[in-house]
């Protein structure tokens, strides 16, 4: 059998190929197993001829990296568990859009020995792709329409099982539970953490990892994002970057494949309180100071003596909200400092201020179309005072990112940012709101209810970026 395998094997530069006669749907055909042996390339493919009544109907193929979850061998049969892109059938227009579909392909070999050899070869090829073997899955049962557990059972779990990935699932029970989990989790047992949630839980996990004593190692743990909440901008941004359809299944497959990319982490603090990543205001006076990224130096005005920053000393909290001075452990925030001459400013009034490090804020809102996962910048979007008709138009155009072309919108990339929220124009007794991924964390003194955990409205915020500090599972 080994001699036969060597005889059937063809080698070209960086490629190893083998052809066998197989049976598919009781029809004999030729199938070719091709592996890439070139350094830096991933996987291989299985290609076979399709025939009907002895007539050729073309070829089909499965790419082990892009299309296959796993392989199973029983007797003379090889089952390839695929999650491949197929064309939808349109009722009125023939072929429709493409979508990923879960499908099994069974190939019957001539002998059990050949089935075992091919099965082992395919399995080793998939193994070489660097996919995760052990995952810790955090499910938020409260986010969005409270569908997290259902999404996990119907869309996530079947794909993980088909891929042969072991996992432990835990549901969050209260706010900041995911942060506590990440803070205390034995990371040596896992190859990644997957979150079935909105963006808020992902932020909690990042904060938990960064509060650990071993944060430098902990933050390298790859994070997977599966949409299951209200704000799913991170998952939408990842899938949109490779033109994949937005779905929990596609996000899960991105984790299964094991591709990774770096993610910028923004340190946002106010006095001794850790803060936010995204926030929005109504029409308010306020002050924004920033260090523009390369190519955006013409935005704003240079800071003069009257506009110098009068913010407080920046101290981060420990894992659960206690400031710790010299005894504090964990990530201390970005250490990058900027010369005073680099800072510029823009004063209000503003209708809205958005700060993003990914393009999408949710599945249908794209405030920052030029945002990148790891460019060391934050994308700053400022909506200035404008007529209500213009504001309505902006709310519609923000769905595709075209709002940034409006003369009432200022859009730029910054390396650092300082924000001092102001009071509402025409009514200085009314303040605005500050939120992080949909969670309210600060609002004006006029609020009927004031949570003691909220930040102080009106006190300046400072935000800086650590480029590529965290790691994400990504589609490609």
Put a short name on every predicted segment:
Residues 251, 255-258, 262, 275-288, ...:
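Catalytic phosphate-donor-binding core of small-molecule kinases
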Residues 150, 162, 172-174, 187, ...:
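Catalytic core of DAGKc-family lipid kinases
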Residues 2-196, 203, 207-210, 250:
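ATP/NTP phosphate-donor binding region
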Residues 33, 46, 118, 135-140, ...:
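Structural signal for hydrophobic/aromatic residues that build the beta-strand cores
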Residues 53, 85-87, 142-144, 174-175, ...:
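Conserved beta-strand elements of beta-rich interaction domains across eukaryotes
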């Amino acid at each position: 059998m080994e001699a036969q395998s060597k005889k059937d094997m063809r080698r070209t530069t960086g490629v190893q190929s083998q052809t066998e006669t197989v049976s598919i749907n009781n029809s004999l055909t030729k199938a070719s197993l091709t592996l890439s042996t070139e350094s830096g390339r991933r996987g291989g493919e299985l290609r076979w001829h399709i025939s009907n009544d002895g007539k050729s109907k073309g070829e089909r193929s499965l790419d082990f990296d892009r299309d296959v979850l796993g392989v199973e061998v029983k007797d003379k049969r090889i089952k390839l568990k695929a999650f491949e892109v197929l064309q939808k059938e349109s009722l009125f227009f023939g072929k429709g859009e493409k979508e990923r579909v879960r499908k099994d392909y069974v190939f019957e070999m001539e002998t059990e020995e050949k089935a075992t050899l091919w099965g082992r070869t395919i399995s080793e090829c998939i193994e070489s792709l660097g996919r995760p073997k052990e995952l810790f899955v955090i499910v938020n049962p409260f986010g969005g329409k409270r569908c997290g557990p259902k999404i996990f059972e119907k869309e996530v779990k079947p794909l993980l099982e088909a891929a042969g990935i072991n996992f432990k699932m835990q549901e969050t029970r209260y706010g900041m539970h995911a942060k506590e989990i990440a803070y205390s989790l034995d990371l040596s047992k896992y190859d990644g953490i997957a979150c079935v949630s909105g963006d808020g839980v992902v932020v909690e996990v990042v904060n938990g990892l960064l509060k650990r004593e071993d944060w430098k190692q902990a933050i390298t743990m790859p994070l997977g994002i599966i949409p299951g909440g209200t704000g799913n901008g991170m998952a939408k941004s990842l899938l949109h970057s490779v033109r994949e359809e937005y779905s929990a299944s596609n996000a899960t497959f991105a984790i299964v494949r094991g591709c990774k990319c770096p993610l910028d982490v923004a340190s946002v603090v106010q006095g001794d309180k850790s803060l936010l990543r995204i926030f929005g205001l109504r029409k308010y006076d306020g002050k924004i100071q920033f260090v523009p990224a390369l190519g955006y130096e013409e935005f704003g005005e240079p800071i003069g003596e009257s506009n110098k920053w009068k913010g407080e000393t920046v101290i981060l909290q420990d894992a659960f909200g206690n400031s710790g001075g010299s005894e504090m452990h964990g990530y201390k925030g970005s250490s990058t400092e900027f010369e005073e001459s680099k800072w510029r400013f823009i004063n209000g009034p503003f209708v809205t201020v958005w700060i993003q490090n990914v393009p999408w804020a949710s599945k249908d809102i794209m405030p920052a179309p030029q945002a990148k996962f790891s460019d060391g910048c934050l994308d700053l979007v400022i909506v200035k005072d404008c007529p209500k008709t213009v504001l309505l138009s902006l709310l519609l155009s923000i769905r595709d990112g075209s709002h940034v072309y409006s003369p009432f919108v200022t859009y730029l990339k910054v390396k650092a940012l300082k924000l001092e929220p102001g009071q509402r124009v025409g009514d200085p007794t009314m303040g605005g709101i500050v939120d992080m991924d949909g969670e309210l964390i600060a609002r004006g003194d006029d609020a009927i209810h004031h949570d003691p955990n909220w930040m102080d409205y009106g006190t300046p915020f400072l935000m800086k970026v650590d480029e590529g500090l965290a790691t994400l599972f990504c589609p490609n």
